[in-house]
Regions:
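Membrane-interface alpha helices of multi-pass inner-membrane proteins
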Residues: 264-267, 286, 299-314
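Hydrophobic alpha-helical membrane-interfacial segments at the cytosolic entry of transmembrane helices
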Residues: 94-103, 215-219, 304, 336-362, ...
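Hydrophobic, aromatic-rich transmembrane alpha-helices
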Residues: 282-290, 323-334, 399-420, 460
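Membrane-embedded, hydrophobic transmembrane alpha-helices
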Residues: 1-91, 425
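Hydrophobic/aromatic-rich transmembrane helices and adjacent perimembrane loops
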Residues: 189-192, 273, 318-321, 441-460
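Transmembrane alpha-helix segments characteristic
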Residues: 102, 297-308, 323, 344-350, ...
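Perimembrane helix-loop-helix junctions
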Residues: 287-297, 302, 306, 319-351
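Active-site lumenal/periplasmic loops and adjacent helix-entry segments of GT-C-fold
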Residues: 102-279, 314
Length: 460
């Protein structure tokens, strides 16, 4: 276990140096979560690169560490240091905002991931289906050494179209000798810090307000829906929140309440979502500064950060593409100039080449081979196969999202132009997700819809 902790610390240290180099004016409140995003990205990229040639084996893992150390040494040689960071008088507000949610998350990770009680492993409702799958993938990749992996559940006869880098970031620690629970949890800790910290930093940067950043943070992670109304009728109904199965104010299928809490129903059970957002939220923060604040020098750092995103979380990669497309239109609308367009071309070329190499033999191949992955469907889980809706379109989102949904139009009208453009990227995501399904289960389009919701919480 100690060796695994040291290995993770190496990648996180390089991630912090990368964040410091990318954003030299950043305070520790920016560098720490941004550095966690860079560190996890490197942990996904480097072992996979060597595993393509050597298999997912100890030599590949060792060479990845050497490469990470080399990157860190290069940054140090160029004068990058973690000391002397900018002072931020608002950093205390960040940590005060994050601390309660971080403590809740740590407790839930402890109780939901292979929690041994009286000789039996315990978990929670949200992890019943997802965690066994993830544990199987993590163990299989480490034990077989096969890379690119194939689905172990199907006897190795089908290509692995699932974004498997969210598993290799734990498989690497199994290869290093860690037990399965330790390997499962280790990379999740910096990933959560990146998600929480960079959500807050993005919200503050976009709104230029500490108070609005804190409000957006809790509106998103704690929820603003109206599902609680269904549990106010009697004491038994209210008690059912704690004792029933799929009877919570954010997950009550019987009443078409399915806008789940992102912490307990997305980030903890669904590793692809966690590690995808761990990279996506820092990326959107850099995109805001790159596109809407004119910091064109950031494009190589943005490209480096998101290199593994399609195989960490394909939905997050698609969401980022749409945000970049709208950002590119914004740049063109300001008057195209060579010095503003070249960085966009560089970003598109690097990400386009790297992402296609990853996706052609995996995600795209599975989407196009007749497995009903890509099809038309309207209104997410509210839409039925016969074309009808379970609830009125707007009422469905009003009762599921609540206050934030009701405030979107007035907030958009009062927003500054750059904020409207950023949210325009969210509207592009919403429009696509409401008409096209990208996987066999309609429900999983929420992985796109929640990115729209992130921007909606910041806007509102």
């Amino acid at each position: 276990m100690l060796f695994s902790v040291f290995y993770l610390s190496l990648f996180l240290s390089v991630g912090l140096l990368s964040a410091r180099r990318a954003v030299p004016d950043g305070s520790a409140a920016v560098i720490v979560p941004l550095g966690c995003g860079f560190g996890v990205s490197l942990l996904a990229v480097l072992p996979a690169l060597f595993a393509v040639v050597l298999g997912f084996t100890p030599p590949a893992v060792a060479l990845a560490a050497v490469a990470a150390a080399g990157i860190g040494a290069s940054l140090l040689y160029r004068g990058t240091r973690l000391r002397g960071m900018a002072k931020d008088p608002d950093s205390g507000a960040l940590w005060a905002c994050l601390l309660p949610v971080v403590l809740i998350t740590l407790y839930l990770l402890h109780t939901h991931v292979l929690h041994l009680v009286d000789g039996a492993y315990h978990t929670g409702q949200s992890c019943y289906g997802d965690m066994p799958m993830h544990l199987g993938f993590i163990k299989y990749i480490a034990q077989s050494g096969e890379f690119l992996p194939r689905y172990p559940l199907l006897g190795g006869t089908h290509r692995f179209g699932y974004p498997f880098l969210c598993e290799t970031v734990s498989s690497v620690f199994v290869v290093l000798g860690a037990d399965l629970r330790t390997a499962y949890l280790l990379p999740m800790l910096p990933a959560f810090l990146s998600v929480y910290g960079m959500f807050w930093q993005l919200a503050r940067r976009v709104t230029d307000s500490v108070g609005k950043a804190c409000l957006a943070f809790y509106l998103f992670f704690m929820g603003s829906g109206l599902g609680f109304v269904y549990f106010l009728g009697s004491a038994d109904s209210f008690a059912g929140i704690f004792t029933g199965f799929y009877t919570t104010p954010t997950n009550f299928v019987e009443k078409n309440i399915e806008w789940v809490n992102p912490i307990v129903d997305l980030l903890i059970p669904q590793r692809a979502t966690l590690f995808g957002w761990c990279v996506l939220l820092p990326a959107v923060y850099l995109l805001w500064r790159f596109c809407y604040e004119g910091e064109r020098r950031l494009w190589p750092w943005l490209a480096a950060l998101v290199l593994p995103l399609p195989l960490l979380h394909t939905h997050s990669a698609l969401a980022l593409v749409l945000l970049c497309l709208v950002g590119g239109v914004y740049t063109l609308a300001q008057g195209p100039r060579r010095k503003t367009l070249l960085p966009w071309l560089g970003l598109a070329a690097v990400c386009g080449a790297a992402w296609l190499c990853q996706m052609l033999p995996t995600v795209l191949a599975q989407s196009l081979d007749g497995q009903h992955m890509l099809r038309l469907h309207f209104n997410w889980i509210n839409g039925q196969d016969d074309g009808t809706l379970r609830d009125n379109y707007f009422w469905f989102y009003i009762k599921n999202i609540g206050l934030v949904y009701l405030l979107l139009i007035p907030a958009f009208l009062r927003a500054k132009p750059k904020q409207r453009w950023l949210y325009g990227g969210g509207l592009a995501i919403l429009a696509l997700a409401e008409f096209v399904v990208f996987q066999p289960n309609n429900y999983d389009n929420n992985k796109l819809l929640y990115v729209w919701h992130i921007l909606g919480c910041i806007l509102a």
